[in-house]
Each structure stands twice: as C-alpha cells, then as structure tokens.
C-alpha cells in the first residue's frame, strides 16, 4: 500500500474526517508536554534547556498566528474558488516571511536588551522554523478541506506531529 492510498482510501469520508480530526487534536496537544518531558528527563540537573524550550515554544506558537494569519477558515469556505490556490499560497508565503522576520527581530531584541545567549537565540529560531512548516502546510491542508478531504489533511498533520515528537526524542 503506497502513501497516497493510505491517506486517501476510506469508505466514509465524513466519519474518517471526524475521527482523524479528533486524533490530530489529541496528538497536537501532546507535542509540547512530551518534548518537555524528554528534555527534562535527559538532563534533570540542568533545567535551563527546558526553560529555553518553553520560551521558544511559546514564542513560536504566538508567531504561528502571524504565519497562518487566519486564512484557513476563509480558504476552506471558498468552495466556489473565488481565489485560486496559487493566490492563497502566495499570501501564505508572505505571511510566513513576516513570521520569520518577526522571530528574527524578537531574537535580536532578546540578544541586545535581555542578554539572550546564542543558544537561546538559535533554539527560538529553530522552533519558529518548525512552526513555519506547520504554517506553510496549513495552506495545503486548507486546500484539502476545500476539496472535501479534511481526513487527508488531518492524517498528514498527525503524521507531522508524530515526526516532531520522534525527532526530539532521537536528538
């Protein structure tokens, strides 16, 4: 069974969308706590890494709103395709650039005025980069939802969350 078939094959799209949306929400909610547990358990004497991760994750989640800019609801409800996917993609590209520019600005400000270490600077940028992938993939998930295949979008998103958790556990 190939990946395309695994993502798209279902007997009931509505039920599959509902179930996978619920699974995706649960996995999404587990990302930060599980990664934080891994960080604190890997070196319990040095909790600085956990603090840096917490700040980075909080900043990245705030900036994710800028990267997504609330277009998903608008895009998925555009069933008559008044705007093309290329237009949504282009707008998302601009909002993602703004997101990373804001992240860089935040890190520079923190380095100058708050004495952020280079470690904190780069961890914040890396976590923001991780959220950049989420913001960018959201426009593709919006397209899937627009085409009536929310189940494909949520399966993809759930897989990405699992890879995030696994990669942090490995590193």
Q: What do these predicted ranges mean?
A:
Residues 9-69, 100, 126, 130, ...:
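Signature of the first transmembrane helix
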Residues 42-47, 82, 146-147:
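Helix-loop interface residues and adjacent transmembrane-helix termini in multi-pass membrane transporters
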Residues 51-52, 82-92:
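Membrane-interface alpha-helices at helix entry/exit sites of multi-pass transporters
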């Amino acid at each position: 069974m190939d990946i395309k078939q695994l993502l798209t094959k279902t007997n009931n799209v509505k039920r599959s969308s509902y179930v996978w949306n619920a699974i995706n929400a649960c996995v999404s909610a587990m990302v930060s706590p599980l990664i934080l547990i891994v960080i604190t358990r890997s070196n319990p004497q040095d909790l600085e890494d956990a603090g840096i991760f917490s700040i980075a994750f909080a900043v990245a989640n705030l900036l994710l709103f800028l990267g997504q800019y609330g277009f998903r609801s608008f895009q998925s409800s555009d069933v008559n395709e008044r705007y093309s996917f290329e237009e949504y993609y282009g707008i998302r590209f601009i909002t993602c650039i703004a997101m990373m520019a804001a992240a860089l600005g935040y890190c520079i400000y923190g380095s100058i005025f708050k004495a952020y270490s280079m470690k904190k600077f780069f961890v914040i940028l890396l976590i923001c980069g991780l959220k950049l992938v989420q913001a960018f993939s959201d426009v593709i998930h919006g397209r899937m939802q627009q085409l009536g295949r929310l189940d494909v979008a949520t399966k993809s998103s759930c897989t990405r969350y699992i890879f995030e958790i696994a990669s942090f556990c490995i590193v």
